[in-house]
Amino acid sequence: MTEFSSFSAPKGVPDYVPPDSAQFVAVRDGLLAAARQAGYSHIELPIFEDTALFARGVGESTDVVSKEMYTFADRGDRSVTLRPEGTAGVVRAVIEHGLDRGALPVKLCYAGPFFRYERPQAGRYRQLQQVGVEAIGVDDPALDAEVIAIADAGFRSLGLDGFRLEITSLGDESCRPQYRELLQEFLFGLDLDEDTRRRAGINPLRVLDDKRPELRAMTASAPVLLDHLSDVAKQHFDTVLAHLDALGVPYVINPRMVRGLDYYTKTAFEFVHDGLGAQSGIGGGGRYDGLMHQLGGQDLSGIGFGLGVDRTVLALRAEGKTAGDSARCDVFGVPLGEAAKLRLAVLAGRLRAAGVRVDLAYGDRGLKGAMRAAARSGARVALVAGDRDIEAGTVAVKDLTTGEQVSVSMDSVVAEVISRLAG
């Protein structure tokens, strides 16, 4: 007899299985709900795209493009990449389908897996789940504040409260070139290794994003972009903060924040949770005023975010909280006989049509085994019937919380169950 080895999920790729999957779904759906309540429409995008889309949009000097992308040649020898982030794909779709020719801003939200080849650790996976929003077509600081407030509301709707919003401005095209020269002058005066010096020549902001402690110490006194904003960029940032104050969204200004993607301009922000240790970011985003034009579309601005579902789940656990209902069903049917099995299946269908989650005991478990299964399911009510009960036209309705049990006529079961679940 041939023996086969078992398989495991690829390294750095998490499974979400019951009961943990219930919390994952609740977090994802809760974050999405906050966007939909603000008028954002759902968009579904390909898992893989033309590699050039990310190279041009995200930036070739970023770690994402240079080190972390899953890129391969397909059977037509075309270079494709598993999406490492969502914004570039959304902008591509907006251009391709002419969404920017209609009413502006275009407001879109999405959820799904993204892929980065990183060293796996708690909260940092090679397949990461995100919820994102993008608002494209209007350069208005009030829209920046709305997007940030949506993320804040999404986290709070889940009961998460141990996070903080860090925010800064990355300036605009009128002040960034001068700051770039100033920063390069500072960096080239340091004793940098060859690779870091090369990156400083391409995009010096990438050096400030380096996580190595020794380099962070060397750049601690680097000039800060917030001190060199143009009048337009400063006014934009001040207005964003004023709107956040009015909306009651607390924030901390972090002048040393650098986002990991090259397309960000003006407003940039990150939500962090100290309960996650080194991987404290649970989401972030910013404005990208040049990305549409850079990818072949109109010269329209945009603002968006990506929120980590995986990390939000971990943040909730760090606070000792859960989201979602881990119960598999509301009602569990226990048929004791073939006639009872058929009748309870019909009742289950009626209850499901009424919006009640119903499961049934299958196989010949006997009463004790079936009731143990009912308890494990998390159901609040059990329906118990043998063939004699079916002949009499009755079903036992048992409250699994109190233990109370009543005999109910077949025609009254649906109403009785709904009444008990509502109580």
UniProtKB/Swiss-Prot annotation:
The keyword 4Fe-4S does not apply. Pfam families: HGTP_anticodon, tRNA-synt_His. GO terms for molecular function: ATP binding; histidine-tRNA ligase activity. Its EC number is 6.1.1.21. Its main location: cytoplasm. Disulfide bonds: none annotated. GO terms for biological process: histidyl-tRNA aminoacylation. PANTHER family: HISTIDINE--TRNA LIGASE, MITOCHONDRIAL-RELATED, HISTIDYL-TRNA SYNTHETASE. Homodimer. Belongs to the class-II aminoacyl-tRNA synthetase family. This is Histidine--tRNA ligase.
